[in-house]
Curated annotation (Swiss-Prot):
The keyword Secreted applies. This is Potassium channel toxin alpha-KTx 11.1. Has the structural arrangement of an alpha-helix connected to antiparallel beta-sheets by disulfide bonds (CS-alpha/beta). Keywords: Disulfide bond, Ion channel impairing toxin, Neurotoxin, Potassium channel impairing toxin, Secreted, Toxin, Voltage-gated potassium channel impairing toxin. Binds and inhibits voltage-sensitive potassium channels. Inhibits the vertebrate potassium channels Kv1.1/KCNA1, Kv1.2/KCNA2 and Kv1.3/KCNA3 with low affinity. Also weakly inhibits Kv7.1/KCNQ1 (10 uM of the toxin inhibits currents by 21.43%). It comes from the Eukaryota. It holds the Pfam family Toxin_31. InterPro entries: Parabutoxin. Disulfide bonds join 8-27, 13-33, 17-35.
Amino acid sequence: DEEPKESCSDEMCVIYCKGEEYSTGVCDGPQKCKCSD
């Protein structure tokens, strides 16, 4: 398993947080990210 990245590009993954779409955050899987906040 690869270690989580510090950031993700929108091409790598899209996350949803607080009802808004984000394209940055900690990678958590091939198509998921965690919110940076």
